[in-house]
Amino acid sequence: MIVPMKKVTLLVLGSEQERSLQALRSFGAVHVQLRECASEQLAELHALDARCVQAIALVTDAQTKNVTRGEECRVAGQVVEAAEAVEQIVRTHSDRVELAQRIAQCIAHLERCEPWGDFDPADVRALAQRGIHLIPVELSERSYRCLPDELQTLCLARRGGLVRCVLVADKPGLPPSLPADARALELPDVSPADLFVRLRQLREECATLTQRLLAYSEYQGAIRALRQKIAADIEFERVHLSMVSVDVSQWRETGETLRIAHVSGYLPVSRVRAFSECARKEAWAYCCVDPMPEDPVPTQLRNNRWVNLISPLMNFLGTVPGYWEVDISGFFLLFFGVFFSIIFADAGYGAVLTLVSLGGIVLSKRKHAVVSPAWCLGLYLGTLTMVWGALVCNWFGVPVQYVPASLARIAVWEISGFADAAQRNKNQMHVCFFLGLLHLCLGHLIVVRRTFRSLRVLAEFGSLLMLGGMYVVVLNLIVDKERYPLTGMIVGSIIAGFVLNFIFVNYRVSVRQSVADSMKNVINALLGIVNVFADVMSYIRLWAVGLAGGAISATVNEMTHPLFANFLAFLGIVLLLFGHGLNYVMSILSVIVHGVRLNTLEFSNHVGLMWTGIRYTPFRER
């Protein structure tokens, strides 16, 4: 359920802002309505947090010796603050980057000078001061033969059609008569031999900095703790900046101005009494009212332990219903489990998930830790997958004739591998379409409950009629035309449903105004019939993805079966595990794409759920 909220406005003395905010944070139940704000302190906190992220990224691959979770760590016998460690890590990395650039430059100079042998550029510069300019030049042999006679050259080497020579000139710079393909050597500041020495020194310095950076790997715990503190400081600063100060009056005796600061937020109704006691204790003034539809009210979901199993998936997706919308967590959990089982469609895969989840639960209990809802969700999904896989008699893609009789007796003949393939597929598609009809009708029934006192409820009854008619149309097209004919009653239900939906879907004040609003969007209204057909048809994806996964499992078994008859049995086991593991991962991705979509798109559209909610994040100690 969505927890009801109250909008609260808090008023405090301007001189008591920080103390009041600390008390409000200790209370820990008010979701503060933040404003767009900026300050120098906030910018510094964000910059420090960015440096912490950079520092963790720099040392995360280093070998961690002793991860310390305090605010201080010891490296090389010296205790330093975590913030100082961050600065040292960033500075060390900056020095490494600078050294890497110098090493790259040194290597580039060596590569250019290597064909010219060892020489001392200082001698060349000394001769240039005496008026003798030596210019190392590389050019093609043909261009070398065509050099003018007035150019004095000394040929050093001929290799690969290239000539390396030295031009002797009485002034600096390349002569204008030199061919276009001639390239002069850029002289380094020292000799190649000295470059080698410099390169070795730079690499040693870089290795030293690398070891120093590796030593900071034990700071990761401290830096993460520092990030948590920074996050709390950022939140406090943003709330502080969101408080609006107003000058109320001025004392005649002292001339001091009385300033009042106020901030707004949202509070669960169940905490209003506790907030009132806190306000009385802290001498606050406050106003507590019901939120308006235009207010950005946060959404807090509170469900029982069973429905709360879906929370890991909802947190992963980041989907939150709006405060004024409906919570479908229970229906989401129920149908997501069914869709999961049909997409996996393998009792063996379900057994693996069940055993892994049970192992996680047992391990958590042995450690006296709280069992994560993710393990319970895995147990629920694995159990449903085992049930559906047993009904269709699919155990790791093994042909039904090799399945033990005790397991084969569990199967439902019409939808299992014992039936004819064509008929089995039609029956399974029929099951998927029926689930789709049930799923979408349930969505409209939820809306019926919310709009029962309004004529708009007739639009939902019209949608139900269209869904029923389109369900038969889909069965006629996909499953069996003779068994599911398109009678006049079916067509009439679709038309009647469309008329009811068209007239009352925009009902607010009067039927006439509702029809007028529908006429403005008549094209979208007509396309709505197609959308209903597409939504029912969309549930065929459950059968299609499950069929594909079963085919992959069977193919993997057929490919590896011959290997078990000879000495390649070990290779067969490896390929079997790899193939089924890959299929398992692909099935998980299919669930995320298809199983989640049917809940968050098709079902949500029929409920009128837009997932535009703001997660309830109270201002509290972290």
From Swiss-Prot:
Entry keyword Lipid metabolism: no
Cellular component GO terms, alphabetical: plasma membrane; proton-transporting V-type ATPase, V0 domain; vacuolar proton-transporting V-type ATPase complex
Taxonomic superkingdom: Bacteria
Membrane topology, as annotated: Multi-pass membrane protein
UniProt record, GO biological process: vacuolar acidification
Entries under InterPro entries matching the protein: V-ATPase_116kDa_su
Chief location: membrane
MF (Gene Ontology): ATPase binding; proton-transporting ATPase activity, rotational mechanism
Subcellular location: Cell membrane
The entry's keywords: Cell membrane, Hydrogen ion transport, Ion transport, Membrane, Transmembrane, Transmembrane helix, Transport
Described function: Produces ATP from ADP in the presence of a proton gradient across the membrane.
Listed name of the protein: V-type ATP synthase subunit I 1
